[in-house]
């Protein structure tokens, strides 16, 4: 909130008038200082300062302004500027009646001081009525240009467009001694209107004491003499002082304190309801802090014989004290609930961390088992591949042996066929020899023919013997080869039987390995399914550890973070989590 403050206090006494002194201003800063014609004196012992009145109101309220009697208004350069703002008077005919002071309200942009007509001037100095009081009034004008940042100050009771004047009147009362006459004192009221750029101060010198002047610097260096407004223009150039006498001490206006206390009470109540709302949002138990006889207790604490305004102010104060007590209890209960919820959260977090560590250990164990299963499966596949390759080699060798056996059988059948042909030829030759012998015996009977026949017979017999011997050798050779072939075939058949037996063993081992691989693949799929489904299905075999724990699903402290959080009282619903830990380890056969 940007505001401008102006204050002026003056202490005047009887004496000759000096020329008014113009106090220059320094821009963008406000300074309050004192000037004195002599050295600063120690504080007076017989002077008592008493705060008489404090009043606040909007800009449309009547503000008392004083000016010399029947004086014309002298417009200063300050009033002609565009930034000058005037007060708006609510009633132009209102007058404040006093035995010694007549104050009238005027139109905007005018300031008047009405002097009592009974006062006279008999000398160049002003004749002052003996009045043992000096009133010092202070005006503070605030111009709030924006709303306060706090959300508790925003509401229907805040009007950012109104300028508020705080009038602070301080009476300086001088104690009079019995043996000493009354020193004439003067009372002056200086009213500073909103946004003055230059403040002028006129001081009068007193023979007995020094004159102190307190001024305030504004923003612009424009200056005028306030003496033009307080002095009459005449030949003697005598300054007429205003003599103000009050009826007595002004009464304290209770409206300001009443409004202030009411505003504080409303803000205290809003704070209490805000705390109560937050306590309900986090799920705390709403305790009944209100007592039935609270109003009776407040009324009993108010003393009797006071005015209604004072009673109302005391009532506001007592209500604010009770509301502050309730707010304190609500804050303490809220902190206790938050501490309890944080304890629950910490316990749940520790249990979840422990479960997470156990699950990670179980998962690492299953990962090692899975790696062992994969290594075993890879070794089984390599052995199976080697066995299949050896089986293919043995089957190719068996096929080659069978082909050789078939070729030997074909050669043996050919040799038997040739042997039969040779026997048939032998029979034909014997038959032909016999026929020739019969012909020769029939036709020729001499010794030469007999010799020729013997010779031919011998020749044929030798030829037959040679041929028989040759054929016998060939038959023996073929038989030996056939026996050798039979032996080779029998050996090869034995090796084939060995191969067949070994092949049968390999096929049986392969079937066992296939069944083992199927079983391990099923277990592996189950393990993967358990890993993916987060241990929803129990694994077959092995040792299984089941851990059952209950966790709270509602945390009311989260209501402070989310507006749409719905609190469910504890104990109504809990979630049960079952943790299964399996320890299955495969051993290689």
From Swiss-Prot:
<dbReference type="GO" id="GO:0030036">
    <property type="term" value="P:actin cytoskeleton organization"/>
</dbReference>
<keyword id="KW-0965">Cell junction</keyword>
<keyword id="KW-0796">Tight junction</keyword>
<protein>
    <recommendedName>
        <fullName>Protein POF1B</fullName>
    </recommendedName>
</protein>
<dbReference type="GO" id="GO:0005923">
    <property type="term" value="C:bicellular tight junction"/>
</dbReference>
<dbReference type="GO" id="GO:0030057">
    <property type="term" value="C:desmosome"/>
</dbReference>
<comment type="function">
    <text>Plays a key role in the organization of epithelial monolayers by regulating the actin cytoskeleton. May be involved in ovary development.</text>
</comment>
<comment type="subunit">
    <text>Interacts with nonmuscle actin.</text>
</comment>
<keyword id="KW-0225">Disease variant</keyword>
<dbReference type="InterPro" id="IPR026186">
    <property type="entry name" value="POF1B"/>
</dbReference>
<dbReference type="GO" id="GO:0005912">
    <property type="term" value="C:adherens junction"/>
</dbReference>
<dbReference type="GO" id="GO:0051015">
    <property type="term" value="F:actin filament binding"/>
</dbReference>
<keyword id="KW-1066">Premature ovarian failure</keyword>
<dbReference type="GO" id="GO:0070830">
    <property type="term" value="P:bicellular tight junction assembly"/>
</dbReference>
<feature type="coiled-coil region">
    <location>
        <begin position="334"/>
        <end position="443"/>
    </location>
</feature>
<dbReference type="GO" id="GO:0005884">
    <property type="term" value="C:actin filament"/>
</dbReference>
<keyword id="KW-0175">Coiled coil</keyword>
<keyword id="KW-0009">Actin-binding</keyword>
<dbReference type="InterPro" id="IPR056240">
    <property type="entry name" value="POF1B_HlH"/>
</dbReference>
<dbReference type="GO" id="GO:0007015">
    <property type="term" value="P:actin filament organization"/>
</dbReference>
<dbReference type="Pfam" id="PF24617">
    <property type="entry name" value="POF1B_HlH"/>
</dbReference>
<dbReference type="GO" id="GO:0003382">
    <property type="term" value="P:epithelial cell morphogenesis"/>
</dbReference>
